[in-house]
């Protein structure tokens, strides 16, 4: 589950209310009834194994880059804290699969592949225009959508400084649109918590 940094203190209170008092061993909380909660810092925050440090760092405002991509669409933005300050969304037509067989199927597959490559090249261009000028101010690059599309975009040589900032957190998002990009900010800023109830 993802918890907004400003709601973390309340979540910890509720965890204690549901499972009893807890003790912390680094970022692993163990409650009286045996339930555990493992916390992961948000992308771009300093790595820590201390709960109080995590609470402080998670609440700090950070600039993060966002790159959401699927085969025919890309959304790129910069968030300063919870606010989207720069963004660009672009779509490309990429033909779907066809039921035709033989030469037609191969021709359509080549066309689809060429359309996907053109969309990725345009996505890399947008990422370069929006994110490269900001690269020194970004604490992380959070990606999402389709792994192959994102990896293809970030494989562009000029984007290597961005690839170095890429967070392990990968967001599951639908077709990238501006509203999807705005919603992704909350996921990118959140403290990720894995709760295991007692058996």
Annotate each predicted stretch with a short phrase.
Residues 1-199:
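Terminal alpha-helical anchor/extension segments at protein ends
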């Amino acid at each position: 589950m993802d918890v907004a940094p400003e709601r973390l203190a309340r979540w910890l209170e509720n965890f204690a209310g549901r499972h009893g008092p807890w003790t912390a061993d680094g970022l692993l909380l163990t409650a009286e009834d045996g339930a555990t909660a493992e916390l992961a810092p948000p992308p771009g925050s300093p790595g820590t194994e201390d709960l109080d440090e995590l609470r402080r760092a998670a609440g700090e405002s950070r600039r993060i880059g966002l790159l959401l991509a699927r085969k025919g669409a890309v959304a790129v933005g910069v968030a300063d804290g919870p606010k989207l300050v720069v963004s660009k969304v672009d779509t490309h037509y990429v033909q779907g699969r066809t039921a035709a067989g033989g030469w037609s199927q191969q021709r359509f597959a080549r066309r689809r592949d060429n359309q996907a490559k053109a969309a990725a090249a345009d996505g890399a261009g947008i990422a370069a225009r929006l994110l490269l000028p900001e690269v020194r101010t970004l604490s992380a690059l959070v990606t999402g959508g389709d792994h192959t599309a994102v990896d293809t975009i970030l494989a562009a040589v000029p984007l290597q400084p961005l690839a170095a900032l890429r967070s392990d957190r990968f967001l599951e998002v639908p077709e990238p649109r501006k509203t999807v990009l705005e919603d992704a900010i909350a996921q990118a800023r959140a403290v990720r918590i894995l709760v295991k109830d007692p058996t």
